[in-house]
């Protein structure tokens, strides 16, 4: 491995990211494919990945931390994960887990995807304690064999990689499984010096106001009326291709757009629908129409900064649409979607450079909130992979995945994950709400007209 400091990026230094990001792929296995051959192919792919991108076979450490300074996260060499050792872990749960066919036939409900069994690490935002005897790998891949299939969970340490980075890791494993060489461009981008990927503002350049990202002192945080986490629950819902088309058409009425908005994407329309219907059931419960409701979207800023998709570092910028609960519940879908699109349109190179400069200048980054002030009983945050063509990817002897999921981990209230679009054009959405709000959502006629319950 070259100088470990090269693996330090700017946006990945928030302590809250000391956790693991997960993407799970499911594959059917025919009887004529031996598990031994699958393990051999996966292990060869994992070794090739860690050889081509050495920091992936390293451990994540924090250096330079102390009073008033949260230090820097980087990957350093670790024999435990570096070739000839492997970042692949293998588990067989054939005897005591549902079959692959049962999971897929049920459309992949969260109840059949136990992260404590089918994943090697806990998930963001749950952190971990690392030590010499139990170091934190930059990436672990767990292959869980069950009757009729295999589940591949990619668990990437979040200070070093965002969702786009994990997707690129998956792409390179698929490339190797197809018997192809990892492209030179992918190797160069994966190993580039991260410290200067985002050009920070010069001292003389004005910085935007990012004070909303500073955490208020504990004494200033009002008591949260939300019930115990034991009452929070993850649930999957499906939006069919025809439903997505209908929502896009409804949300594309320019008469209701904010004047600055000229276009609404399908993802805008879907996120606006999620925002509006969840806000509506919460308004019925809370009876607080004037409370501001925020939807925060995690945005991949590689394109904004002209950084190739092969780059694996943290490149996420959060933007929010805001409307009072009462207005949001009664607004047209086009109005809600245009509010979200207007927020996306505010992202440009200067805004990102200003944000990165603000983060870089804070020695104690524990004082920063990931996306600003957030009331989980009102606000919500969404991360979307809808445009990622994982269902069409070729994994050599495994074929294409029949299921893409985030496994079931500790609940994170008001968090939404949008899964990649299937070959048929459907999109599945994972939502964490209180049981009461999930029940109210499933009883909402407007919701059930468009969303199919998976569980």
Swiss-Prot record:
EC number from the UniProt entry: 2.3.1.-
Sample GO molecular function, one term: acyltransferase activity, transferring groups other than amino-acyl groups
InterPro entries on file: CAT-like_dom_sf, Plant_Fungal_Acyltransferase, Tri101-like_N
Entry's transmembrane regions: none
Inducing factors: Expression is positively regulated by the azaphilone pigments (MonAzPs) gene cluster-specific transcription regulator pigB.
Applied use: As colorants, MonAzPs are widely used in various food products for centuries. Moreover, MonAzPs also possess wide-ranging biological activities such as antibacterial activity, preventing hypertension, lowering cholesterol levels, causing hypolipidemic effects, and displaying antiobesity and antitumor activities.
Keywords: Acyltransferase, Pigment, Transferase
Keyword RNA-binding set for record: no
Pathway recorded for this protein: Secondary metabolite biosynthesis
Null allele phenotype: Leads to the accumulation of pyran intermediates devoid of the medium-chain fatty acyl moiety such as monascusone A.
Pfam families linked: TRI-like_N (PF22664)
Top class in the EC scheme: transferase
Entry annotated with the keyword Cytoplasm: no
Family indicated by similarity: Belongs to the trichothecene 3-O-acetyltransferase family.
Protein role: O-acetyltransferase; part of the gene cluster that mediates the biosynthesis of azaphilone pigments (MonAzPs), a complex mixture of compounds with a common azaphilone skeleton very widely used as food colorants. The first step of the pathway is performed by the nrPKS pigA that forms the hexaketide precursor from successive condensations of five malonyl-CoA units, with a simple acetyl-CoA starter unit.
Identification of the protein by name: O-acyltransferase pigD
UniProt lineage: Eukaryota, Fungi, Dikarya, Ascomycota, Pezizomycotina
């Amino acid at each position: 491995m070259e100088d470990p400091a090269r693996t330090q990026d700017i946006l990945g230094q928030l302590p809250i990211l000391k956790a693991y990001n997960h993407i799970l792929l499911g594959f059917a296995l025919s009887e004529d494919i031996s598990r031994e051959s699958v393990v051999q192919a996966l292990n060869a792919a994992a070794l090739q990945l860690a050889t081509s991108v050495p920091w992936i076979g390293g451990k994540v450490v924090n250096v330079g931390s102390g009073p008033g300074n949260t230090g820097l996260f980087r990957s350093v060499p670790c024999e435990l994960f570096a070739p000839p050792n492997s970042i692949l872990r293998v588990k067989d749960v054939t005897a005591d887990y549902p079959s692959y066919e049962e999971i897929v036939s049920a459309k992949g409900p969260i109840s059949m995807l136990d992260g404590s069994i089918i994943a090697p690490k806990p998930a963001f935002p749950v952190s971990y304690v690392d030590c010499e005897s139990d170091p934190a790998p930059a990436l672990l891949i767990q292959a869980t064999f069950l009757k009729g299939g295999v589940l591949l969970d990619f668990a990437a340490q979040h200070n070093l990689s965002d969702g786009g980075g994990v997707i690129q890791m998956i792409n390179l494993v698929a490339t190797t499984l197809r018997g192809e060489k990892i492209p030179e461009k992918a190797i160069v981008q994966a190993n580039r010096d991260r410290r200067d990927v985002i050009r920070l503002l010069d001292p003389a350049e004005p910085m935007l106001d990012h004070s909303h990202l500073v955490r208020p002192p504990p004494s200033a945080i009002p008591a949260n009326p939300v019930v115990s986490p034991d009452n929070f629950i993850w649930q999957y819902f499906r939006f069919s291709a025809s439903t997505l088309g209908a929502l896009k058409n409804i949300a594309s009425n320019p008469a209701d757009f904010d004047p600055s908005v000229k276009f609404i994407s399908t993802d805008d329309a879907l996120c606006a629908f999620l925002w509006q219907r969840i806000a509506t059931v919460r308004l019925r419960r809370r009876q607080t129409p004037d409370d501001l409701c925020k939807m925060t979207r995690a945005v991949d800023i590689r394109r904004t900064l002209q950084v190739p998709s092969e780059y694996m570092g943290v490149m996420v910028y959060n933007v929010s649409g805001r409307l009072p609960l009462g207005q949001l519940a009664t607004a047209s879908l086009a109005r809600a979607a245009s509010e979200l699109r207007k927020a996306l349109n505010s992202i440009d190179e200067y805004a990102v450079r200003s944000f990165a400069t603000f983060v870089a200048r804070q020695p104690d980054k524990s004082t920063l909130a990931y996306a600003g002030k957030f009331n989980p009983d009102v606000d919500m945050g969404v991360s979307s992979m809808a445009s990622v063509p994982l269902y069409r990817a070729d994994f050599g002897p495994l074929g294409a995945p029949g299921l893409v999921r985030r496994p079931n981990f500790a609940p994170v209230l008001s968090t939404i994950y949008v899964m990649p679009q299937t070959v048929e054009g459907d999109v599945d959405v994972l939502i964490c709400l209180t049981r009461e709000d999930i029940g109210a959502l499933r009883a909402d006629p407007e919701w059930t007209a468009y969303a199919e319950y998976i569980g």
